């Protein structure tokens, strides 16, 4: 059992500002290849960032990096490599380790070398936004070592409408408690905060809406 609690806006803001500065520098580095937009997603966009008081792992942020390559000049592995190399040029200057390449995201971590704790981390998903809230992301297939564009699961669709409904019906506080409980009970280290939050929103919406 974990012991997750919410991070205050005051604590999260300087880290968020630093990550945005890193993203701006990455945009400058890759502009000869393609451009991209960014936006915080998941708990990062809803003031629901958490950290586990029982672990040595700090809080985490999530950003979507929307790649503009409509003519498909670059393959998924080329895009991922260009982005990873650019992030690796910038992030270490701010005290972060080099990127970790996981199935859905590129992750950077700021580690306190004196006590071997992770102060905070950030997951970058490389995405393409289609119509009707449908989104693709670059997936790293670890078994065969290749990269492909894949559609996000249906659980991420129409989340904004469900969030609006929950807020209008004064269920946001209940959702926050539900999300923390799910995080505390999660034993899958590969399940990221963004997925747990999407599950929480969908489950709460279905339960209350009927």
Protein language model regions, located:
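Charge-rich, solvent-exposed alpha-helical interaction surfaces
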Residues: 18, 22-25, 82, 86, ...
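Alpha-helix boundary/N-cap detector
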Residues: 10, 14-17, 21, 74, ...
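Active-site nucleotide-donor binding segment shared across nucleotidyl transfer reactions
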Residues: 30-61, 65-73
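A broadly used, surface-exposed interaction patch
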Residues: 63-89
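Helical scaffold of the NTase/Pol beta-like nucleotidyltransferase catalytic core
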Residues: 1-41
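Short glycine-rich, low-complexity/disordered patches
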Residues: 26-42, 92-108, 185-201, 208-210
């Amino acid at each position: 059992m974990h012991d997750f609690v919410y991070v205050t806006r005051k604590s999260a803001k300087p880290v968020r500002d630093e990550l945005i500065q890193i993203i701006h520098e990455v945009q400058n580095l890759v502009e000869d290849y393609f451009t991209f937009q960014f936006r915080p997603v998941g708990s990062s966009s809803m003031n629901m960032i958490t950290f586990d008081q029982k672990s040595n792992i700090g809080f985490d942020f999530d950003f979507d990096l929307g790649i503009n390559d409509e003519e498909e000049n670059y393959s998924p592995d080329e895009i991922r490599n260009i982005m990873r190399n650019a992030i690796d040029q910038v992030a270490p200057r701010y005290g972060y380790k080099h990127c970790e390449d996981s199935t859905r995201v590129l992750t950077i971590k700021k580690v306190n070398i004196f006590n071997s704790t992770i102060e905070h981390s950030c997951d970058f998903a490389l995405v393409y936004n289609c119509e009707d809230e449908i989104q693709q992301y670059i997936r790293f297939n670890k078994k065969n070592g290749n990269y492909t564009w894949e559609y996000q699961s249906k659980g991420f669709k129409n989340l904004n409408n469900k969030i609006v409904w929950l807020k209008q019906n004064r269920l946001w506080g209940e959702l926050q408690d539900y999300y923390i409980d799910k995080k505390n009970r999660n034993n899958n280290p590969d399940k990221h905060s963004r997925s747990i939050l999407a599950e929480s929103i969908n489950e709460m919406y279905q339960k209350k809406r009927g």
